[in-house]
């Protein structure tokens, strides 16, 4: 199984990099992890809605280039479905049993995701209505992916 995490922008915070590296290492027992950062677009301070749409479209093109034609794609979006960790774990298991070898997770930039990427997605999930930095969501997501594997193993990690 392959887990691909496509994100917008370069992660600069060392504490987040360290956490992501740790969980990636833990997940490596179960799946190959590929972390892909696509460049973000500079957003003018008082950007119009049209400018924001153009920025998301450019970032969306870069994301689309990294999605495999046979990937199962899950986007993080505020309007996505909120799942308990156990349900998320079962969903990941069901996806692999359905014949997919790669699950691709996508986290957009500070403006969100282009609609075309959302439409390409097989599933949209949300971690709630709170607004969180997209850089922090990388760590939260990768921890939940690790937790999903631990649930599948019956590990006491998930209590």
UniProtKB/Swiss-Prot annotation:
Main localization, broad class: cytoplasm
Originating gene: rlmH
Recorded family membership: Belongs to the RNA methyltransferase RlmH family.
Organism, as annotated: Leuconostoc citreum (strain KM20)
Catalytic activity from the UniProt record: pseudouridine(1915) in 23S rRNA + S-adenosyl-L-methionine = N(3)-methylpseudouridine(1915) in 23S rRNA + S-adenosyl-L-homocysteine + H(+)
Name the UniProt record assigns to this protein: Ribosomal RNA large subunit methyltransferase H
Binding positions for S-adenosyl-L-methionine per the UniProt entry: 76, 108, 127-132
Primary enzyme class: transferase
One of the Pfam families matching this protein, by short name: SPOUT_MTase
Localization terms from the record: Cytoplasm
Keywords for the protein's UniProt record, in alphabetical order: Cytoplasm, Methyltransferase, rRNA processing, S-adenosyl-L-methionine, Transferase
Subunit structure: Homodimer.
Domain of life (superkingdom): Bacteria
GO CC annotation, single: cytoplasm
């Amino acid at each position: 199984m392959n887990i691909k995490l496509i994100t917008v922008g370069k992660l600069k915070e060392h504490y987040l990099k360290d956490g992501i590296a740790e969980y990636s290492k833990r997940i490596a027992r179960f799946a190959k992890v590929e972390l892909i950062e696509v460049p973000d677009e500079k957003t003018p301070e008082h950007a119009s809605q049209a400018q924001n749409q153009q920025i998301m479209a450019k970032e969306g093109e870069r994301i689309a280039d990294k999605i495999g034609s046979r990937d199962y794609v899950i986007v993080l979006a505020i309007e996505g479905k909120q799942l308990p960790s156990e349900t998320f774990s079962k969903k990941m298991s069901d996806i692999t049993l359905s014949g997919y070898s790669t699950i691709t997770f996508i986290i957009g930039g500070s403006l969100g995701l282009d609609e075309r990427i959302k439409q390409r997605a097989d599933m949209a999930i949300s971690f709630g209505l709170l607004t969180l930095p997209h850089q922090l969501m990388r760590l939260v997501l990768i921890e939940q992916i690790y937790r999903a594997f631990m649930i599948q193993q019956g590990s006491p990690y998930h209590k």
